[in-house]
């Protein structure tokens, strides 16, 4: 649905706050539909030029919460909806989440989901917005991961930033997802030590569980 920009920004902030509280999830957010498209009886059409869309996307994410538990993307894709037997534009936050899931299956969470090796977007006919090199730089410096069409490479995710607004190790998707993975694994090991005596044996057992895991 083509909701107002402010409504979409508020929803994005709520989703990010949930991820921040949980500490074991990441919120994937796409810009509002009105940043690119006009929906009418004849269908959806791209209504802005690339420079205007760049400004629209940056403007959309500017007030959205700074968080390493969020990932922002830049565009919508045009795809075939087999259930409705029609083509339509859809946001790409689901695709970026899918890249991370596919990365977990084929590699590990601490691998970047971006690039031609792991960042290929499937089931896309075209993009509503394909940023130029200059526009990619503008987006990336404003926490937005560009999605581009690359000749010979197809449609790919071309950035691996989180929504964190300051320089940090956690401004990278793979670093944040690595720490989510580690925290979940270590907390599971810690649960096994609950209600044991707080003595040298218990502490040594815990260290012997965690240290080999971290080394591997």
Question: Model-flagged regions — what are they?
Answer:
Residues 1-216:
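Structured, hydrophobic secondary-structure cores that serve as assembly/anchoring elements
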